[in-house]
Amino acid sequence: SNYHELYKVSDQYVQDRLAQASKDGYVEVAFGLRVRTPLLAQVMWGTGRVPYEAQAEGRTAGNALGQSYGLLNNRAAVAFMKKVWESPYRYDIKPEALVHDAIYIVIRDDLHVVDWANRHLIQEMRWQELPEIQHDTVKLGAALDIFWPDWSNATTLPNDSPKEVIKELCTKVKHEFTKP
């Protein structure tokens, strides 16, 4: 299928890790967490003779491999909030929720605060220090969306944009929603 063509490198990575799990009895996921795979340890992964139960364990371990990297979002949120609490903006930026790959924060309606958050949050979202996710061309990234006047309208701020660009974008959106 198209999915498997598009993600063949990722698919191969998972298959290689599952083959290793059949030798080790566990698969190592994000941040070194080990997920035990006792059934895989009893089979030769990748052969045509893997029992259904071991195949199911392989699917679960494969899902854990990919889904565990959702912890990168948590790592970014913790690192960002540490910076917030050490900054003059500790009362201006509040964490609200983490959902999969999104960090929801409430930011005071102040250009300096928004600019600071746009720089520091994106810096933490770009973090790529785990050896298994380091790559010369594929980089992690993110963008800060401002929702105004409500959750149905998102304005994406360009990364590393100067304050003037942020102000211009936000002013434009405000004028669109306050037209008579």
Name the predicted role of every residue range.
Residues 1-180:
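Conserved catalytic core of nucleotide polymerization and phosphodiester-bond processing enzymes
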